[in-house]
Amino acid sequence: MSQAALNARERAAEKNAARRSNGSQLAGVIFLLMVLGTILWGGWVVIGWMKDANRLPLSKLVVTGERHYTTNDDIRQAILALGAPGTFMTQDVNIIQQQIERLPWIQQASVRKQWPDELKIHLVEYVPFARWNDLHMIDEQGRSFSVPSERMGKQVLPLLYGPEGSERDVLEGYRAINKVLAANKYQLKMVAMSARHSWQLALDNDVRLELGRSDRMGRLQRFIELYPMLQQQPDKRVSYIDLRYDTGASVGWAPVFIDNQGGEPPINGQQNSNP
């Protein structure tokens, strides 16, 4: 066979191979497009299925954590305030968390979903340490919050008063004062700090102490030394002790009623003394 014939045959074979290669590539591209189309269509169907409110609705609620003031209905109403709950796939738990943490006695909430239809919520409530300005509470860190009064029951807490934003200062003062009084067998009931940082106390026997703005602890020590002598006064009960002096104190006496066994009218005595 001549060289020309051989060359022609080789060129024909190369053309046939090229056509087969192009056909294979085209078939591969078509197959890839079909696969991608199937995936996209399947994803669209799944997304539509997940968004369907009748598919995987969040129908179970589990609330955990130590609770003293929070009811299941509180949580349920907080969630419903956002509208109808979403499905397992569409509901944003961060929104629910923020909504629950709006309850003024909730310190922290964590929310998560559990397959297939459960919403789990863990709560951390504020723990009241004292009452603040009658309307609120503060915790051990001096953070102010509120609890519905009907849910507090008969819980007895210290009474603290002060300007807005002074919670931590008043709490720190209460702790320092209470430590000294408790060591001397006195029970502190109330602490108030005015806008001018003047301090007033009340003991559990309703004796009121005026400490003023300076030398708070020194004046408190003066009360501890003075009060036992005042208690020895016959037929008298201390109402208040004003310690806002460099030395001594001003004492107010409360009315005392004596048992009327001799037919005499009750004695209603009150006087001030300056030791």
Curated annotation (Swiss-Prot):
A GO CC annotation recorded here is:
FtsQBL complex
Localization, per the record, is: Cell inner membrane
Q: Which Pfam family, an example, fits this chain?
A: POTRA_1
> Which InterPro entries does the record cross-reference, listed alphabetically?
Cell_div_FtsQ/DivIB_C (IPR005548), FtsQ (IPR026579), FtsQ_C_sf (IPR045335), POTRA (IPR034746), POTRA_FtsQ_type (IPR013685)
Where are the bilayer-spanning segments?
29-49
Q: How does it sit in the membrane?
A: Single-pass type II membrane protein
An example GO biological process term is:
FtsZ-dependent cytokinesis
Q: Where is the POTRA domain?
A: 56-126
* Membrane side Cytoplasmic: residue ranges: 1-28
Provide the membrane-side ranges marked Periplasmic in the record: 50-275
KW Transmembrane (keyword) present: yes
The yes or no answer to whether the keyword Repeat is present is no
Alphabetically sorted, this entry's keywords are: Cell cycle, Cell division, Cell inner membrane, Cell membrane, Membrane, Transmembrane, Transmembrane helix
The record's subunit annotation is:
Part of a complex composed of FtsB, FtsL and FtsQ.
Q: Which NCBIfam families match?
A: PRK10775.1
Protein's job: Essential cell division protein. May link together the upstream cell division proteins, which are predominantly cytoplasmic, with the downstream cell division proteins, which are predominantly periplasmic. May control correct divisome assembly.
Q: Which family does it belong to?
A: Belongs to the FtsQ/DivIB family. FtsQ subfamily.
Q: How is this protein named in the record?
A: Cell division protein FtsQ
Q: Which organism is it from?
A: Yersinia pestis
Instruction: Tell me what gene encodes this.
Output: ftsQ
